[in-house]
């Protein structure tokens, strides 16, 4: 079974950032080879439209057959608002709440990000999962790309 990995904008952008490039590039290469399924959202696609050309080329290198796109639908919006209402994230970070909610509602295997303040943050992960369980959703795994690479 191939892992379905929701990938936020920071990971694709990380391919062009010296600090994050090694693990971001390796993960994207796994998507290109079809070893993992790249799960994006319509929100991620919108955010990437404003990214540098080099970042957009990284995404374009992944065959469409290896990509799944999830929608920011009413279910995800409602779940994101529940994270905000519970104080897990402030309202000004609604886009981050949307990423978590889309991945949760889409029941991905893991969400990867380099956003340590609002996403890959133990206290917030506990908050997201507390809301998820109260709302009848499964807990969400949130990791960095380094933690999900095949040979790490």
Question: PLM features: residue spans?
Answer:
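Short, well-structured N-terminal submotif of metal-dependent ribonuclease cores
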Residues: 1-40, 46-61, 67, 85-91, ...
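General small-molecule cofactor/ligand-binding pocket signal
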Residues: 39, 70, 141-143
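C-terminal end-helix/capping segment
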Residues: 122-141, 145
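Extended, non-globular alpha-helical segments
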Residues: 58-61, 71-72, 144
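Residue-level signal for beta-strand positions within conserved beta-sheet cores that form or flank
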Residues: 34, 112, 138
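Active-site neighborhoods of divalent-metal-dependent phosphate/nucleic-acid chemistry enzymes
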Residues: 68-127, 149
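Generic beta-sheet signal
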Residues: 41, 113-114, 145
